[in-house]
């Protein structure tokens, strides 16, 4: 399967996609287009290049911040003493229920990191909001770390994201 990643086009039908998670399915059907249109999130879709109108997965990115006090001291020591650190948040990620277990979720995460690292927007931390413990385990495979205070929230320093993107580019 040759995946095509692109921004959710305005007016694109969102019928036919389900990931099996009621909250994510509802977001996809009712909110994704509005969030992108109103500037609350960038919605990136994945489809097979042969059938570009059939969505097989999506994710959202948004500007965010994290309190410096939430970052472990070893990392925070190397950052400016601003109260909040600029971040990018991977808020939602979903794969069609019929295609789960085929590493499409991993490709969505890698595309989100690549897209974020190639952006001229300044950010230091990449945030992920996992929906359940099983998802936390998935993100930890990419070397995301848990926040001590919020066990379903994870983070990665930009330099780590850039290393992953660089390794990914070499393997292609």
Model-assigned labels for residue ranges:
Residues 56-57, 148:
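A structural microfeature
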Residues 91, 96, 100, 131:
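Residue-level recognition of the GNAT/N-acetyltransferase active site
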Residues 101-114:
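Conserved acetyl-CoA-binding loop-helix of GNAT-fold acetyltransferases
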